């Protein structure tokens, strides 16, 4: 009796414990009674063994068939409970150790605690669903998944494990990808915003730079004094005296001794003659900018220029004139410049200085001297220009002991000068009249490329209007007839002066001989010879004897024809500078240049050419008066062109202020 109950007691224990452990056959026997019997206990007892059996038994086919009936029977109360367990079980297998924790739970309380344990996992499952975006879990095992998973595990241990192990990584991968896409999209958005902001910032910086440049271009116009006042070659009277009028230091030393050995190195700046107007070398920065109108000059302090010129040392003196001095200087960058100091009390106002600096800053051409900068320090006003190292045409053509310029070099100089003047007359808007064209204002580099200098006093002429100057601008011998008679200047006045310079290149003679060796001016002497040469084609008598007939006949014809047309008395009959350029280049016939007049009917000799503006006899008389006036002027004789000058030829003198010292009053015709 006692044994029977003992045997009966283990029987149910084994019934509870063995069916889950055995797995396949007992589960098949127990599965049919479960539907008729109470669904809650059977459903509860079934899932725990399924979980434990998921790892041990491989067989699955019979269980898979039984799984569908279990799902409907347990669907109302159980689907929610086992479904969370099954997701817990697949999710823990991925981390590795959650599965061993689940098996002990069913043996502890198969009936009572089974409903309690499913409830806690449900929030965990919900958390897992929320964490893994839940959609994938529902897709893999929604309503059928919990029972099928349990049945599949019981019947097939190997097959369900891969999907379980795969499903969490898939879910995690999907969640990672979905969660990773958002940061990537955000990063791309941030990068795009940063790039756009950078571009906007760069655009703003560019706009600011452009605005600053425009402001700087306008600022140089605020400069004060007159720009080009000294004519170191003695042409100072012209007010814009040549910039470079005695370049080599040997030549400069001689000039210094001649002009006045008492000049101290600082006197040019401090004394009344202190401003040696300088066409100084342009610094590298302004020179390219000078190529365009509205160029920005560099500003210098007086101390900087004093250091550059070694205290305006006499050894650095390039030239002198009635309006000041030109000194050679070296900037800290190593660039050589010519510093022109303007003489105080020269009659130039700040507004005039501002206007002239603005004019020069707008002009840039390969055959024009460029402005580098300027300095205004108290009463001192200095201009800085590019330094042209090989002196002037006057120096090479008329200087004592200088080698003879060969013919190709003379043609090259004539053509370069013509191009520079044509640019001033026709390519600048408004056009610029030089008003002081002469050999002393033609600078040369070592390859004898031409740079036209000293056009700082040039006035802007508007359209076809001419202006009357109160000063005599230009050097004696270069003055146009209409200026001597009426004081009017135009671009055709520059053409006349250029014609005189062409005659210098052809003949090797100065425009006006103050030594008395040549009675007439160069123009009066050359006119009949030009007419004769045009008629018989023989230019030997007109050509410079130092050339020894080594010249091109065709080029001589072109140059002589241009000179003859340029020195016509009637300004209206003179060609434009652009026409002269074309003629010198050989692109225009001489008939076109002479406007159809035959050599025997040249306008400068024919009766009709004795225009109402001026006639040849009056011009000759006035030139003689100019010559007499120059000889009477002591200041002029003490200049570099005086009898003791290095040149010794007194080739150029000029200007108004010398003539306005009472001599003009004695000669009212002037």
UniProtKB/Swiss-Prot annotation:
GO terms for biological process: protein autophosphorylation. The chain crosses the membrane at residues 187-207. Residues 599-613 have a biased composition (Polar residues). Residues 312-590 form the Protein kinase domain. Mostly expressed in flower buds. The modification Phosphotyrosine is found at residues 385, 483. Belongs to the protein kinase superfamily. Ser/Thr protein kinase family. The active site is at residue 436. It catalyses: L-seryl-[protein] + ATP = O-phospho-L-seryl-[protein] + ADP + H(+); L-threonyl-[protein] + ATP = O-phospho-L-threonyl-[protein] + ADP + H(+). This is Proline-rich receptor-like protein kinase PERK5. Residues 14-31, 132-141, 167-181 have a biased composition (Low complexity). GO terms for molecular function: ATP binding; protein serine kinase activity; protein serine/threonine kinase activity.
């Amino acid at each position: 009796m006692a044994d029977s109950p003992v045997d009966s007691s283990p029987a149910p224990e084994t019934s509870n414990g063995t069916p889950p452990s055995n797995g396949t056959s007992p589960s098949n026997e127990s599965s049919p009674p479960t539907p008729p019997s109470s669904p809650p206990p059977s459903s509860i007892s079934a899932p725990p063994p399924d979980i434990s059996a998921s790892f041990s038994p491989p067989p699955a086919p019979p269980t898979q068939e039984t799984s569908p009936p279990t799902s409907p029977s347990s669907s109302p109360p159980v689907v929610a409970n086992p479904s969370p367990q099954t997701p817990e079980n697949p999710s823990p297998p991925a981390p590795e150790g959650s599965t061993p924790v689940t098996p002990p739970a069913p043996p502890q309380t198969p009936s009572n605690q089974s409903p309690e344990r499913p409830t806690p996992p449900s929030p965990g499952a919900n958390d897992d669903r929320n964490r893994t975006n839940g959609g994938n879990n529902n897709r893999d095992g929604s309503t059928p998944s919990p029972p099928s998973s349990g049945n599949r595990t019981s019947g097939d241990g190997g097959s369900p494990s891969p999907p379980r192990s795969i499903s969490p990584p898939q879910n995690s991968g999907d969640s990672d990808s979905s969660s990773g896409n958002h940061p990537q999209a955000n990063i791309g958005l941030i990068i795009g915003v940063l790039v756009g902001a950078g571009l906007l910032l760069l655009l703003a910086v560019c706009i600011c730079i452009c605005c600053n440049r425009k402001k700087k271009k306008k600022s140089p116009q605020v400069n004060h004094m007159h720009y080009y006042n000294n004519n170191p070659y003695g042409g100072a009277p012209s007010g814009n005296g040549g910039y470079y009028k005695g370049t080599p230091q040997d030549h400069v030393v001689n000039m210094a001794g001649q002009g006045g050995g008492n000049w101290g190195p600082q006197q040019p700046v401090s004394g009344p003659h202190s401003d040696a107007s300088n066409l100084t070398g342009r610094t590298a920065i302004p020179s390219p900018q000078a190529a365009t109108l509205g160029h920005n000059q560099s500003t210098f302090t007086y101390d900087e220029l004093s250091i550059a010129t070694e205290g305006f040392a006499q050894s650095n003196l390039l030239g002198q004139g009635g309006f000041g001095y030109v000194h050679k200087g070296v900037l800290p960058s190593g660039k050589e410049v010519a510093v022109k100091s303007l003489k105080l009390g020269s009659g130039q106002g700040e507004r005039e200085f501002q206007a002239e600096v603005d004019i020069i800053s707008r002009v840039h051409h390969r055959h024009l001297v460029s402005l580098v900068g300027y300095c205004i320090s108290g009463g001192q006003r200095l201009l800085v220009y590019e330094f042209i190292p090989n002196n002037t045409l006057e120096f090479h053509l008329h200087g004592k002991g200088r080698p003879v310029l060969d013919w190709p070099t003379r043609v090259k100089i004539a053509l370069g000068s013509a191009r520079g003047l044509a640019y001033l007359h026709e390519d600048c808007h408004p056009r610029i009249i030089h008003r002081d064209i002469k050999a002393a204002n033609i600078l040369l580099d070592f390859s004898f490329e031409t740079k036209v200098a000293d056009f700082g006093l040039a006035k802007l002429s508007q359209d076809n209007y001419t202006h009357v100057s109160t000063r005599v601008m230009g050097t004696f011998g270069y003055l146009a007839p209409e200026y001597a008679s009426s004081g009017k200047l135009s671009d055709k006045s520059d053409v006349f002066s250029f014609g005189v310079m062409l005659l210098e290149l052809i003949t090797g003679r100065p425009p006006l001989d103050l030594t008395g060796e040549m009675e007439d001016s160069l123009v009066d002497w050359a006119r009949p010879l030009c007419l004769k040469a045009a008629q018989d084609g023989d230019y030997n008598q007109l050509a410079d004897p130092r050339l020894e007939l080594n010249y091109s006949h065709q080029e001589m014809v072109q140059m002589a024809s241009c000179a003859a047309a340029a020195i016509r008395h009637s300004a209206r009959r003179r060609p434009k500078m652009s026409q002269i350029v074309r003629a010198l280049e050989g692109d225009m016939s001489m008939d076109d240049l002479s406007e159809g007049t035959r050599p025997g009917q040249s306008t400068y000799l024919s009766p009709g050419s004795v225009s109402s503006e001026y006639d040849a006899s009056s011009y000759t008389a006035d030139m003689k008066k100019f010559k007499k006036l120059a000889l009477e002027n002591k200041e002029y004789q003490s200049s570099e062109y005086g009898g003791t000058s290095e040149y010794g030829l007194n080739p150029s003198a000029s200007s108004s202020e010398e003539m306005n010292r009472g001599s003009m009053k004695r000669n009212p015709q002037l």
